Regions:
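Conserved ABC ATPase signature
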Residues: 1-5, 26-30, 83-84
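GG-anchored amphipathic helix commonly corresponding to the ABC/SMC/Rad50 NBD signature/C-loop
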Residues: 1-19, 43
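Short, glycine-/Ser/Thr-/acidic-enriched flexible segments
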Residues: 7-9, 26, 73
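Conserved D-loop-proximal element of ABC-family nucleotide-binding domains
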Residues: 12-14, 26-34
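Walker B catalytic acidic pair
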Residues: 22-23
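C-terminal lobe/lid and adjacent interdomain/linker elements of RecA-like ASCE P-loop ATPase modules
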Residues: 31-130
């Protein structure tokens, strides 16, 4: 999280095109996750951001979601990466909220995605025009 704070403050001066945050959600939840998601998304104005997270509050801010799974084939471990379609994003966020994707968790995930979309739209609207 310290690196996130530094990158947020120095984002205009940092020429690094891609920033990678691996499990930045460790030890946080709820509102803190929301703030981390907001800060990560703000970095996308000047960088490509890749983030591994298990926190729905952070995942909801992603513009694109990928699901990463390890599978074993003939005693070899393979990593499978799939880009998720919009309906799959809802199901995945519902899943990381608490296991099985129930009707309630699906509605909560839809609301979380909608709220993050509105936040991003509002934030972008208040940026100075170039």
């Amino acid at each position: 999280r310290l690196m996130l704070a530094l990158k947020t403050i120095l984002s205009g001066a940092d020429a690094t095109p891609t920033l990678i945050f691996d499990e930045i959600d460790s030890g946080i939840s709820g509102k803190s996750g929301q703030v981390v998601g907001e800060k990560l998304w703000q970095l996308t104005r000047q960088h490509q951001v890749l983030c591994v997270t298990h926190l729905p509050q952070i995942a909801a801010f992603a513009d694109t979601h990928y699901n990463v799974n390890k599978q074993i084939f003939d005693e070899r471990t393979m990593t499978i990466v799939n880009e998720l379609r919009p309906e799959q994003r809802v199901r995945e966020i519902a899943h990381i909220m608490g296991g099985d994707a129930t009707e309630f968790s699906m509605k909560s995930a839809e609301e979380m995605l909608a709220r993050s979309y509105l936040w991003k739209e509002n934030w972008a609207r208040h940026l100075p025009q170039a």
